[in-house]
Regions:
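Accessory DNA-binding and partner-docking regions appended to nucleic-acid-acting proteins
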Residues: 1-22, 375-376, 404-621
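Short helix-to-turn junction characteristic of helix-turn-helix DNA-binding domains
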Residues: 46, 241, 292, 386, ...
């Protein structure tokens, strides 16, 4: 979807670039013969010297959207990026393709800074990655002001907004700096997740009210989604990771304590596992992140502090040990799976305790009642997702404002029908009558106590023990009733107010049930880990592998790992898994055949072609 802007800016004399020329750049440097559908329009806009906002899901190839224009334009492209590790990975990935790029952040010595700036001023660098914190220095701002800037790119642009899930105050410096320049350059802002609030902040704070806005669909068809409600989360996690022994995964936990618990259990199970949270030293976090990125660890257990700083494309699963606080965070974190476009799994393990933990954190960390109310509404949407009996993918897309013509995706736990439908109309009527009989003045805890027949002081004083529904569900445990209430909210039978003490009220749907016009069903899940052994990665990734290619794929992975260690690079920067899969399937024997593999550009062909051809020839499987 494009919202057309009108402003053009011509600061440097720019060449007219045709689509064919841009495609030649794409094939030469990146090894692809065509743009993805979402890439072509923002690339064309930047080449026409028009401001752009790109809201594109992880894995859609948003970096290409500004890297191709950077190669085509005269002058320098400045890229603002939030994390040092993310900058390094991206610059290393460009350098390995012979694209002149550099970075400036706090890790550089004065000598390294001077050398980099000399190369920039000499026109030897096309893309310069900068941490936005550097804009706090007047000296550095003056240095940048003298450069021939063709375009400025703001990556992870949601960081500029307090409405976003990863607000960084340093991003506010970018807009101020842009306004201070004698001539404003073309600006592109890119992010994987942005609600309308965040999008408006990006426009306002970066001066992009007239930008072309490209919103690519949030759907990631290669990702399967599941919600598992189980009290035995640890057993599930250990079993799952064992079943996926040859695959990379991330397990997110809400607290440091849970990170350590899961890490210790997986370590005892013999898994190559790392852990990452704010309680660890910078050195330990750096070591863990590097080991995971270099494929020395199979799985990383982490708080949400981990992830944005890593550009790892071959993550095959993301497990959430607890429910995240909101859908924005979940989409961002789950989206770290399958960035190479190959199938991956996103599984959320839910417990009612998660809700109380997040409510407490919201109340403790957010001061203003208005902001608390916003966060509590977001939390309720996350809870509704966990109890959604319809398509999870459709729910997620609708949350982000994207409509769908289909009702089922056949690739989520709801659509796959991983459970039995149980009629809970009796329980629903009891709960609805309790809410109606108390004039819709209470929340889930009080209603649960009433239908269970608990003679608390509060209930007795109010006379609620005289209600006809008092004790009607005395044989149902508290946890199950509260779970049903959450499901009824998610299904639209009940409304839950926001605020510190949410109050339940009936909708028209509940009134239909009470009138006997409608029955209510609950999905009772079968909680189990798929009984398959670890998936053959080649079969999983493409579904087109020939017999024996799985062994060759693993052989090529080990070869890539050795090359990466020798060069000091992340393995996936040499070639992503998807390229190795094609190599294992196609088994090229000449450089010409090797160069025809999608994702192999000229620079990588020259650097690694003969080495991989030899590895393929040596394989005896």
């Amino acid at each position: 979807m494009n919202q057309q802007g009108t402003r053009k800016q011509e600061n440097l004399k720019q060449p007219v670039v045709t689509k064919q020329q841009a495609l030649r750049m794409l094939e030469t440097y990146f090894g692809y013969t065509s743009f993805r559908p979402a890439q072509e329009a923002p690339i064309a806009s930047l080449l026409r010297n028009e401001d752009v906002i790109g809201i594109m899901p992880t894995g859609a190839g948003k970096s290409i959207c500004f890297q191709i224009p950077a190669l085509c334009k005269a002058g320098l492209t400045i890229v603002f990026s939030p994390l040092i590790s993310l900058m390094k990975d991206q610059v290393d990935g460009l350098l390995v393709q012979n694209i002149p790029a550099a970075l400036i952040n706090s890790t550089l010595t004065q000598a390294e800074f001077n050398k980099t700036m000399y190369e920039v001023r000499s026109g030897k660098i096309k893309l310069l990655y900068i941490a936005p914190e550097r804009l706090g220095s007047n000296f550095f701002c003056n240095v940048l002001r003298a450069l021939p800037i063709a375009q400025v790119i703001v990556d992870e642009a949601h960081c500029i907004s307090e409405w976003g899930h990863d607000f960084r105050p340093s991003y506010r410096l970018i807009g101020e700096w842009l306004n201070s320049l004698p001539k404003r350059p073309i600006v592109g802002a890119f992010t994987a997740t942005a609600t309308k609030y965040v999008e408006n902040d990006i426009k306002k704070l970066l001066g992009l009210n007239h930008a072309n806005v490209y919103v690519t669909g949030f759907d990631r068809p290669n990702l399967s989604f599941a919600v598992i409600r189980t009290p035995k989360r640890m057993d599930y996690v250990v079993h799952y990771v064992r079943q996926h022994a040859n695959e990379n995964g991330i397990i997110y936990c809400a607290t440091r304590k849970d990170v350590d618990r899961v890490y210790e259990n997986l370590t005892r199970a013999g898994i190559k596992v790392g852990h990452y949270h704010g309680g660890l030293s910078d050195e330990v976090r750096r070591e863990m992140q590097n080991a995971y990125a270099d494929d020395k660890l199979q799985v990383m257990v982490a708080t949400n502090a981990f992830g944005m700083g890593i550009d790892k494309s071959n993550v095959r699963y993301v497990l959430h040990y607890q429910m995240p606080r909101n859908m924005e965070s979940y989409y961002q974190e789950a989206g770290r799976a399958g960035r190479d476009g190959a199938p991956a799994e996103c599984i959320l393990l839910y417990s009612g305790q998660d809700v109380q933990v997040h409510k407490y954190l919201i109340e403790q960390s957010i001061e203003t009642p208005e902001r608390q109310a916003v966060e509590l509404r977001k939390l309720q949407s996350m809870i509704d997702y966990c109890f959604c009996s319809n398509c999870l993918r459709k729910y997620m897309l609708n949350y982000f404002g994207e409509s769908t013509v289909w009702t089922t995706c056949d690739n989520c736990s709801s659509c796959k029908g991983s459970g039995d439908k149980v009629n809970v109309t009796k329980e629903a009527k009891a709960i609805f009558r309790a809410i109606m009989g108390t004039d819709e003045r209470y929340g889930a805890s009080m209603i649960t106590s009433i239908v269970r027949g608990e003679r608390t002081d509060r209930i007795m004083r109010a006379g609620h023990d005289a209600l006809p529904v008092f004790g009607l569900l005395s044989d149902v445990d508290e946890k199950s009733i509260k779970g049903l209430i959450q499901q009824f909210v998610a299904s639209g039978y009940l409304r839950s107010s926001t605020g510190k003490y949410p109050v339940l009220s009936l909708t028209a749907g509940a009134e239909e049930v009470l009138a006997g016009h409608k029955e209510v069903e609950e999905i009772r899940q079968h909680v189990s880990v798929p009984s398959r052994t670890s998936r053959s990665t080649s079969t999983t990734l493409r579904g087109k592998s020939s017999s024996g290619s799985g062994g060759l794929f693993e052989h090529l992975r080990q070869h890539r790992k050795r090359l990466a260690e020798k060069a000091g690079l992340r393995p996936y920067l040499i070639f992503p898994d998807t390229v190795l899969i094609d190599l294992a399937n196609l088994r090229p024997t000449t450089l010409g055949e090797f160069g025809n593999v999608k994702g192999v550009g000229e620079a990588k062909l020259k650097k690694y072609g003969l080495s991989f051809l030899q590895a393929i020839a040596e394989y005896k499987g």
